[in-house]
Swiss-Prot record:
Effect recorded for H277A: Defective in substrate ubiquitination
Subunit text: Interacts with IcmS.
Region named Mono-ADP-ribosyltransferase: 760-1000
UniProt-recorded name of the protein: Ubiquitinating/deubiquitinating enzyme SdeA
Up-regulation conditions: Expression is induced during the transition from exponential to stationary phase.
Known outcome of mutating Y33A: Loss of deubiquitinase and deneddylase activity
Transmembrane spans: none
Region (Deubiquitinase): 1-193
Organism this protein belongs to: Legionella pneumophila subsp. pneumophila (strain Philadelphia 1 / ATCC 33152 / DSM 7513)
Length: 1499
């Protein structure tokens, strides 16, 4: 690997080497590592300057070079190749490193010129700035900045970027020997020749035949999901924060009362009372809980298997409400500590006191916590028991795990040896959330430690210390044989578990304690612990030991222990960074923030756009015609799709803005259509002209720019269409709409750049309204990316993150257009009522957002973003944010802007420059034709004759001066002209043309012979000049045909100056000059490399292809036991096809030069996929055939089984359709016959099943309609409608057979039946209500009858008792006698009859008053009673009882006939009136008294 240059950037070693080569000796450089500067001011003062490498950290070795410069006295300067704004970002932290009283000024050089060459600029422009600023009379800082800017721009002109990068690649391993040089530019220019660098000429191939990147389809799994989080977080929730503050105020911020390690610590002059179990520790444990749940959810989305609790849930299933309760409990988990003692007795005491503190807090705040947070007191008691930890149950529920694991994770900072504890705690968490998630937790834990100024321990797999068995604090022992001592193997074990020895164990001879390095090499550890063989640096990387010690004891450490807000902010910053860093690690880094420089096609596009704007007459209805070149709709779509229009806009000028008026006058009647088909089209030209007449009659350019921006904001008809066209998702757009979009998009971008004054915000919102289905897809794609971007600890997961982001990238939704955004989330939530919100985080200023200007109050919050090609918006969070005003779920997608060459699409070149060059060729051909028409063939005789005359003059009487003039000046010109014309030697002719004597020279000879000679010479000069021009134009045409821009320019340079070619018409000279300028503009093009870190790209590709190959092999060898397995295999194969496409694209991107791309590794995978595809297709057909056969034999017994069969049928129909489409797709354009007979046979079987299902469903629906009742009408109606929907699906798949047509005829009849039922529904409801009222009336009649009879019975019984007394018979004797006489039939016991009747009537009443059955059942029960029972039970007449019995019988029979319902309701009214008018209750009537039995009564 090159040691001096990585990509196009100097490494730290390279920076030192270039300065040594220039003669500056062994310099000292500085750095800013992880935000912490390291500057040796002594070395800075000795050297006079110091290169400083910024932006490096634990996971980033390369960064950005800047330079500190020592000026006079205490004056220092800072040079940043990115420009003054970037440099100001380092000003404060670097000024703090300089001597007291120093001043650090930033050199105000321009931006946009770095081009990723910061190291080179430091060694060149930086050194020249140092020299200028240390002169005796130095220039002003402003002049230095301007000079540097001009020098950098001049170096980049004329293909400078490729020259510089070519030189850097040439010196990547070694700088050539030679003399010292003043600066990097001088060194480059003095060594380029010796290095023999070949800078390829800018030649465009006639046709770009290199492989093209292919688009990929999202592979986000549909079957793996977690509920979208509602936004709850430790860092934003006031309830949790209040609990933490309470815990601090009352416990954690108080001094210990015990004696063990209870002395307070002084950090930065501030006291901390509980440095190990205080506020910082507590808040970190709460942060871990959120982090563990977050990473568990990611693991579930990745399809990993997580540990389950007794209720079947996992950590991934923890809800926001549950996590809130857990965090509140965590706030008090160590609040009860008296000191740092941890023995069993004190441990239990502390936890009881912590429990009491928690309970007291809840009681003190009961009104806000119950039931809003905790459901009830029992819920509170549960968490109190977890805090108490009486039974040391650490895994029963998520609360037990998160509270105890959170505490445990934080202990790593104070445990020794760290390797033993980290492995133990890692394995403890690993079972719950998996290995990758656990790595992420412990990786972010280190960032939390840094953020809260805690010590970060290293991890050394080679540690020779004795290993500590964390559980029980024991030891493992190596025995005499050099192997670990183990327990006896258990059943099924090959070898026993490691035997644990107490620390008091006395080693025997030849025994020793197992070391850490030995423990980590054990097979059982290596198989489960990814840290085996790995190393982690302790402390703060890049910081020396003393500085780190000072950091751990700083005031900020104390603030973390004493300030809840400060500590939470530190943790939140670290947590947010941990979500972003894994994304950046997955991609090649990009040092600059500025937009990339234009490529050759974008320059050509800008020139074409300028020509159209200046001359809109070239616009026709369906094309643009320029210099014979016909540009149709696809050309302009290519410009929108492949050019970065913001870059194109940077090449336009105010004249182009002014030409909008010209364009709009030409397009006065062109209609522009909104994407809403119901919207009225608007004539865009007429709109613009009227707007300018009213608002900008003076034609002010700045106002015109604002008006252009205002037009962009018009979503009613303009922007919706422009946005859709720009993103290639429009339908039915006209040519003019596509053309105007192409012209206006870069113009709008330029207007935004020119008018925006505000600093770009770091957070923007964009509101959208999307369908539920589309939103679900976005959530799945976002989750797939989020789940695979995890912080590393030991294992690099970045290749998988790269792949998932490439596969599921959502950036295209915000690309290719000037998207409107806002800094106010209320606007998108309340005003726009968006159901999807894109929250775009831009901490590095990569989006280049521009404020939308001065169009009314409130618009200062509006910003427009044209997403740069090399910037992606990568999701880091998806949040469920309540409901919209329409009741829809609102989702917030949080993205972070990340810049990398990996995002730059590799378009084929030439799509714009090829037609542009043809335009120039056509223009020059026209010039050449005009010159040829005016030019005669060269008259060589004229030259011969003049030569003879010149020779003859030597013998004439003319002056010696004239003779010498002809001999020395005219003669050679004639000779060269003749030679050049005869040999068609353009160089000789050019030299001759330049040597023709001037008019001034001729004026010295004022006689006729000289004047005659001059006239002849002028004619020859015109002849030679025209020949030179024609030859140059011919060469230029040849070069343009080969698309050799440099060759064409070289040819045009041979055309004589205006003075020398004065005989050519002015307009022709102007056309030549115009073509030259157009071609020269192309030479400013920059080819932005898509690979800047070859090592990273190669390693990433190797990891990806290894992983994909492994998955293909697993699929290849996997079993397919059933249809589900086959379908899963097909789904996996589909995803693998997309992964292979990503690999192919990466191979294309890695390709440089003209060599053929070696796709052999990718093609091998593609061949495997093809074999698997065939295997799966065969298995799919076989399993579907089995399923269809089984379906045919299934006989549904009820509606549920029928629906199951229908669902299976629809699935099989889809299966057959998929098989059919896939077979057609594979057959392609083959001329061989396509055999679908097997699928046709299966379709026939399905058709028979379909007819059976339709018939069954029709019957089911008819029965359901007939059984509809008023009280359950809507539920039944809903179910029937669902059945109708199923029926509609089935009907679509029915064929045209007679059986099917007959079934189709029955469907409308069902609908009519339902409609009739729906029409009868109001009367059914009325009937139901009347029935309920009627039952209530019957109950009243029954109750009245019962009460009257009860009174009569009681009176009669009292009367019988009186008669008994009067007869002198006691009750006992009487009962005995009557019992005997009753038994033999001589008498009747009136009392027994009364009681029997009483019980009968009570049963009737109880049945009537039974509230456990509904009204219909009650009526049905009454209908089964005899009229006599009704008469007795209700106390009504015989006639009414008979009439009531008939009515109840009718009511028990269901009907929906309006007439019948009406009749029944009338009958209810009639009988109600009759029984309401009575009741003539039955009374006891005395019968004729019998002397022998005075107790007989009759009814």
């Amino acid at each position: 690997m090159p040691k001096y240059v990585e990509g196009v950037e100097l490494t730290q070693e390279g920076m030192h080497a270039i300065f040594a080569r220039m003669g500056y000796g062994d310099i000292t450089s500085g750095s800013i590592y992880n935000g912490v500067p390291t500057i040796d001011t002594g070395a800075l003062n000795r050297q006079g300057f110091m290169p400083v490498l910024t932006g490096v950290g634990p996971h980033r070795d390369s960064g950005h070079w800047i330079m500190l410069i020592k000026g006079p006295g205490n004056q220092y300067y800072l040079f940043d190749p990115l420009g003054k704004t970037s440099g100001e970002g380092y000003q404060n932290i670097l000024a703090a490193q300089l001597p007291m009283g120093s001043t650090l000024s930033v050199i105000p050089n321009g931006s946009g010129l770095n081009m990723g060459l910061c190291g080179y600029w430091v060694a060149s422009a930086g050194l020249r700035a140092h020299q200028a600023l240390n002169q005796h009379n130095p220039p002003t800082l402003l002049n230095v900045g301007q000079t540097i800017t001009n020098e950098m721009r001049n170096e980049l002109d004329h293909d400078g970027y490729r020259k510089i990068t070519g030189w850097l690649r040439a010196v990547a391993d070694e700088f050539p020997e030679g003399d010292p040089q003043l600066d990097g530019k001088a060194l480059r220019e003095n060594t380029e020749k010796d290095l023999k660098i070949e800078i390829p000429t800018l030649v465009l191939p006639g046709k770009d035949t290199s492989p093209k990147e292919m688009s990929v389809k999202p592979t986000a799994p549909q079957d793996k999901s977690v509920p979208v989080w509602n936004g709850f977080s430790l860092y934003t929730d006031d309830t949790v924060k209040a609990a933490a503050q309470y815990a601090y105020d009352n416990y954690l911020g108080k001094p210990y009362t015990g004696s063990v390690e209870s002395a307070p610590a002084n950090f930065g002059g501030r006291m901390v009372y509980r440095q190990h179990h205080g506020l910082s520790h507590t808040l970190r444990t709460m942060a871990y809980a959120e982090l563990i749940v977050e990473e568990a959810r990611k693991a579930k989305l990745r399809g990993e298997t997580l540990g389950k609790f007794k209720d079947g849930r996992t950590i991934a299933d923890v809800t926001p409400q549950e996590l809130k309760k857990i965090m509140i409990a965590q706030a008090f988990f160590v609040a009860g500590r008296d000191d740092e003692a941890s023995d069993a007795k004190n441990y239990q005491k502390y936890h009881e006191q912590s429990r009491d503190a928690f309970l007291k807090y809840v009681k003190d705040n009961e009104s806000t916590l119950i039931p809003d947070v905790f459901k009830d007191q029992e819920d509170v008691n549960f968490y109190a028991r977890v805090i108490e930890d009486k039974s040391h149950d650490w895994e029963s529920t998520p609360a037990h795990v998160l509270i105890n694991q959170g505490h445990m994770v934080d202990l790593v900072r104070v445990k020794q040896p760290p390797e033993s504890f980290l492995q133990r705690y890692f394995s403890s968490m690993q079972r719950w959330i998996g290995s990758q998630a656990t790595e992420a937790v412990f990786g972010i834990q280190r960032q939390f430690f840094h953020a809260t100024y805690e010590v970060v321990a290293g991890f050394d797999s080679d540690n020779k210390e004795p290993h500590l068995v964390v559980s029980g604090l024991g030891r493992y022992v190596i025995g005499e044989d050099g192997q670990p001592i183990r327990e006896a193997p258990k059943k099924g074990q090959k070898e026993g578990d490691l035997k644990v020895f107490p620390q008091t164990y006395k080693l025997k001879e030849n025994e020793r304690l197992m070391r850490v390095d030995e423990f980590l090499k054990l097979p059982e550890i290596q198989n489960t612990f990814p840290g085996s063989g790995k190393h982690l640096q302790g402390g703060m990387p890049g910081m020396n030991e003393m500085d780190y010690w000072n950091r751990l004891n700083s005031l900020n450490r104390a603030r973390c222990e004493n300030d809840v807000d400060f500590c939470l902010k530190q943790l939140q910053t670290a947590h947010d960074k941990a979500k972003i860093e894994p994304i950046k690690q997955a991609f090649q880094s990009s040092k600059g923030k500025e937009r990339r420089q234009p490529n050759v096609d974008e320059i050509a596009a800008a020139r074409i756009i300028q020509q159209i704007l200046a001359n809109p007459d070239c616009i026709h209805d369906d094309h643009v015609l320029i210099n014979g070149q016909k540009l149709e709709q696809q050309f302009f779509r290519d410009l929108l799709a492949k050019c970065e229009m913001a870059v194109v806009g940077s090449l336009l000028n105010d004249t182009d803005i002014g030409n909008i008026d010209t364009l709009m006058r030409h397009e006065k009647d062109t209609e522009f259509h909104s994407t809403n088909p119901e919207a009225v089209p608007v004539k865009i030209g007429e709109y613009w002209i009227n707007d300018q007449r009213i608002n900008n009659s003076s034609g002010n350019i700045t106002q015109k720019k604002h008006d252009l921006i205002f037009l962009m904001q018009n979503d009613a008809w303009y922007f919706s269409r422009v946005n859709a066209i720009a993103q290639n998702r429009d339908k039915g757009s006209t040519f003019k709409e596509v053309l105007i979009t192409t012209l206006m998009t870069p113009l709008t971008s330029k207007a935004l750049v020119d008018t925006s004054q505000a600093k770009p915000p770091t957070r923007l919102f964009r509101g959208l309204n999307l369908s539920e289905e589309f939103t679900k897809g976005l959530i799945d794609q976002a989750n797939a990316m989020i789940a695979n971007t995890t912080e590393r600890l030991f294992t690099d997961h970045s290749p998988e993150a790269f792949k998932q982001i490439k596969l599921n990238d959502l950036s295209k939704m915000s690309g290719r257009t000037n998207a409107s955004t806002t800094t106010e989330i209320k606007l998108v939530k309340e005003t726009w009522d968006s159901n999807v919100i894109f929250e775009m985080l831009d901490p590095d200023g990569l989006l280049h957002s521009k404020q939308v200007g001065r169009h009314g109050e409130g618009t200062e919050s509006e910003f427009s973003v044209y997403l740069p090609e090399d910037v992606a918006l990568v999701p880091v969070k998806v949040t469920l944010d309540g409901k919209t005003q329409k009741g829809e779920n609102r989702y917030v997608f949080t993205f972070v802007a990340v810049k990398s060459p990996d995002f730059t699409p590799r378009h084929e070149s030439g799509y714009a420059v090829e037609p542009f060059l043809r335009m120039q060729a056509a223009k020059l051909a026209e010039v050449k034709s005009s010159i040829e028409k005016a030019q005669r063939a060269p008259d060589l005789e004229t030259i011969f004759n003049l030569q003879n005359e010149v020779e003859a003059v030597q013998y004439s009487h003319l002056s010696t001066g004239y003779k010498n003039f002809l001999k020395n000046t005219v003669g050679p010109v004639l000779e060269n002209s003749l030679s050049g014309l005869m040999e068609s030697d353009t160089d000789t002719l050019s030299k001759a043309l330049a040597a023709f004597p001037s008019d001034t020279q001729w004026s010295a000879f004022n006689f006729e012979e000289a004047r005659q000679a001059k006239r002849q010479m002028d004619a020859i000069k015109q002849m030679v000049g025209n020949k030179v021009v024609l030859d140059a134009l011919t060469q230029c045409q040849d070069a343009l045909e080969k698309q050799n821009i440099a060759g064409a320019l070289d040819a045009l340079k041979k055309i004589p100056s205006e003075k020398e070619m004065g005989t050519i018409r002015r307009e022709l000279r102007e056309q030549i000059q115009s073509a030259r300028q157009e071609l020269e503009s192309l030479q400013r093009a920059v080819v932005t490399p898509v690979v800047t870190d070859e090592k990273k790209v190669r390693e990433r590709y190797d990891a990806l292809i290894e992983n994909t190959s492994k998955k293909i092999t697993e699929l290849e060898t996997g079993k397919l036991p059933n249809l589900d397995a086959v379908k899963k295999g097909i789904s996996n194969l589909s995803n693998l096809k997309q992964e292979v496409t990503v690999l192919r694209n990466e191979k294309i991107r890695m390709h440089v030069g003209t060599d053929k791309v070696d796709f052999s590794d990718v093609e091998k995978l593609e061949q495997q996929i093809q074999v698997i595809d065939t295997k799966l297709a065969d298995a799919y057909l076989l399993e579907v055939t089995k399923q269809i056969s089984a379906l045919d034999n299934t006989k549904p017994k009820n509606q549920t089984e029928l629906k199951t069969k229908i669902a299976a049928f629809l699935d099989r129909t889809t299966d057959i359709e998929m098989l059919r489409n896939e077979r057609i797709k594979k057959h392609g354009s083959s001329k061989d016959p396509l055999d679908l007979s097997d699928l046709d046979k299966l379709s026939g079987s399905l058709q028979r099943i379909n007819q059976s299902l339709v018939s069954d469903l029709i019957t089911t629906i008819r029965v359901s309609i007939n059984q509809m009742e008023a009280k359950t009408f809507h539920e039944q109606e809903k179910e029937i409608q669902q059945n109708f929907e199923l029926l509609a699906k089935l009907e679509k798949t029915l064929d045209k057979s007679k059986t099917s047509e007959k079934l189709r005829e029955d469907i409308p009849k069902l609908n009519d039946l339902l409609v009739a039922k729906q029409k009868a529904y109001p009367q059914m409801v009325q009937m139901q209500l009347k029935s309920e009222v009627f039952v209530t009336q019957l109950r009243e009649v029954c109750q009245a009858n019962h009460d009257d009879l009860d009174k009569t019975r009681n009176a009669r019984l009292r009367e019988l008792d009186r008669l008994d007394r009067e007869a002198g018979i006691t009750r006992m004797v009487g009962n005995l006698i009557w019992g005997l006489t009753n038994k033999v039939g001589l008498t009747t016991d009136e009392r027994l009859d009364i009681r029997t009747k009483q019980q009968s009537l009570a049963r009737f009443k109880n049945e009537l008053f039974n509230d456990k059955i509904d009204t219909d059942q009650l009526i049905s029960n009454l209908a089964r009673k005899r009229p006599s029972e009704l008469q007795e039970g209700l106390g009504i007449s015989t006639d009414n009882a008979m009439e009531l019995h008939l009515l109840l019988t009718e009511l028990a029979g269901k009907t929906t006939s309006p007439d019948e319902l009406e009749e029944r309701m009338k009958a209810i009214d009639d009988i109600s009136t009759k029984i309401g008018r009575e009741p003539e209750h039955l009374k006891f009537v005395m019968v004729e008294e019998d002397e022998s039995n005075k107790k007989t009564i009759g009814f």
